[in-house]
């Protein structure tokens, strides 16, 4: 808190004097807004559970793509559009006949290198099921998209749980394979040159297929690593080992920018924590499904480090397990768990920025009334060249429902199957996370949250436009700071709060106020 605003920056414009100052701030929740809910998908005629919670942040928008729905929001949380996933694919050029069997397992990412959005989903055909992949025509997701599709499996197998990764040269999709009877039969992986997908028209002509890979070698639920940085010369696949616990499988993708990509020798990486999780408890006695120990959300690389998180069993309770891998030498820089003896922690997602900040977000539940309601938590960490530290979990949104269940389902009730956390592409200090949360005993919702890890001093900037002043300050600024104005900076001056109707534009809070007749001073104060 400050008692006066030091004159760090000074502008003089006709009839008005404006003073701007900078203030220290810490890591904080900037905002949260409600995403798509079961009520929304019911209205669209595509209601299902679980939603497969998924989203991504771009320069000016947040996109939510879940089972049954595709929604676009401003960064201030205003919903601009909501359509079914069926209509999304049809608008992008996929025929109704191709997707008539139904759809599942949505993924969406924003790629800073190409300034495009990428999305994937799979059809529910018993045989010949299709993998759908789309990209936006520009960085604006409200504009047009173009999509392609290909058969997911050779033979009489059906795909499940597609994954999506993008790096400087490739777009990667992984799938699990199942027989018609539902038996798991292995995994497949597809490497698509990114330049081919962003071309007009997009093409799959140079896609490399790795069909029916041995999951005992490559692992399960193959994750092509998302890497926003310029090329390392290769891509990376990360997966949980399927032959024994406490192993992560890493495979290099060579030549992903062209036809004929190849896979390197898989390396097994030892880790400390691993066990299949149990269903998560609720105060009302019902349980929810927490899946298994797979990497259900994106695996991300920043610089030389790869960040991953999964759900495991620690003692008798589910825990969030995080790992940071040094990509060049396949060694763990650090790993740890978020756990305690009275709560279950599940469906994590992780992201990191270039200054070493990490955000890990997840659900928490337990058997104790109120405290055990399914809620959203997060933890902040730091990575350096010598190791990784992760802080204690903090509350993002307290749940209000103690007995979530779903009509037509049975305990453990379906939940997840994933969440998503990412760095804002316009500000390395801003992190977004989208998580599932109950909104009624028989209805799920989703919540989008913006969290700042900034440690720098934000600046208040003022410009004049005709008879108005445009005030802007970083979106990463702690919302506890309020904008105030006064006619002078004298000790006796009365500072009045300026009503904050700011909107987020790219990575700035922007507010327009009328130009005053006399001197005006502005400050941020907490």
Stretch-by-stretch model annotation:
Residues 13, 227-229, 473, 513:
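Hydrophobic alpha-helix-in-membranes signature
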Residues 20, 141, 489-491:
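Short, structurally constrained coil/turn elements
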Residues 26-456:
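C-terminal PAP-associated
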Residues 1-10:
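N-terminal secretory signal peptides that target proteins for export/translocation
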Residues 11-25:
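Bacterial N-terminal signal peptides
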Residues 456-526:
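Short, composition-biased motifs enriched in small/polar/acidic residues
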């Amino acid at each position: 808190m400050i008692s006066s605003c030091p004159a760090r920056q000074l502008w003089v414009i006709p009839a008005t004097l404006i003073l701007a100052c900078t203030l220290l701030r810490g890591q904080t929740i900037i905002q949260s807004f409600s995403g798509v809910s079961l009520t929304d998908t019911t209205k669209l005629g595509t209601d299902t559970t679980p939603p497969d919670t998924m989203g991504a942040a771009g320069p000016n928008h947040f996109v939510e793509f879940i089972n049954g729905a595709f929604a676009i929001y401003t960064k201030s949380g205003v919903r601009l559009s909501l359509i079914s996933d069926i209509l999304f694919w049809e608008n992008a050029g996929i025929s109704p006949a191709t997707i008539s069997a139904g759809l599942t397992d949505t993924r969406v990412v924003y790629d800073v290198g190409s300034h495009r959005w990428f999305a994937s989903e799979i059809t529910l055909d018993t045989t010949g099921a299709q993998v759908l992949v789309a990209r936006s025509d520009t960085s604006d997701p409200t504009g047009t998209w173009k999509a392609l599709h290909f058969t997911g499996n050779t033979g009489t197998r059906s795909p499940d749980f597609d994954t999506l990764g993008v790096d400087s040269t490739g777009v990667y999709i992984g799938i699990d394979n199942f027989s018609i009877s539902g038996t798991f039969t292995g995994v497949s992986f597809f490497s698509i040159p990114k330049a081919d997908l962003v071309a007009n028209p997009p093409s799959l002509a140079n896609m490399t297929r790795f069909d029916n890979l041995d999951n005992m070698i490559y692992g399960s639920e193959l994750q092509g690593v998302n890497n926003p940085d310029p090329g390392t010369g290769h891509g990376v696949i990360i997966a949980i080992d399927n032959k024994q616990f406490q192993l992560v499988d890493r495979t290099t993708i060579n030549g992903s920018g062209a036809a004929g990509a190849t896979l390197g020798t898989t390396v097994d990486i030892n880790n400390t924590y691993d066990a299949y999780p149990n269903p998560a408890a609720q105060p009302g006695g019902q349980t929810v499904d927490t899946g298994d120990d797979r990497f259900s959300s994106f695996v991300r690389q920043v610089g030389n480090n790869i960040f991953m998180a999964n759900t495991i069993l620690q003692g008798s309770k589910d825990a969030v397990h995080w790992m940071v891998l040094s990509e060049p030498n396949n060694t763990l820089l650090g790993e740890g768990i978020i756990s305690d003896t009275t709560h279950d922690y599940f469906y994590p997602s992780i992201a990191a920025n270039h200054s070493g900040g990490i955000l890990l977000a997840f659900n928490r539940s337990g058997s104790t009334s109120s405290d055990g309601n399914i809620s959203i938590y997060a933890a902040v960490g730091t990575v350096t060249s010598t190791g990784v530290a992760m802080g204690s979990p903090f509350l993002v949104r307290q749940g209000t429902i103690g007995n979530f269940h779903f009509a037509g389902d049975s305990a453990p009730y379906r939940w997840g199957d994933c969440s998503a956390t990412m760095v804002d592409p316009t500000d390395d200090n801003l992190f977004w996370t989208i998580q599932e949360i109950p909104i009624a005993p028989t209805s799920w919702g989703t919540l989008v949250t913006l969290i700042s890890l900034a440690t720098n001093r934000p600046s208040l900037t003022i410009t004049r436009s005709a008879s108005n002043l445009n005030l802007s300050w970083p979106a990463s600024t702690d919302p506890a700071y309020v904008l105030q104005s006064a006619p002078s900076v004298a000790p006796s001056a009365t500072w009045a709060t300026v009503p904050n109707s700011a909107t987020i534009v790219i990575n700035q809070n922007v507010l327009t106020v009328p130009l005053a007749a006399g001197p005006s001073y502005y400050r941020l104060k907490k």
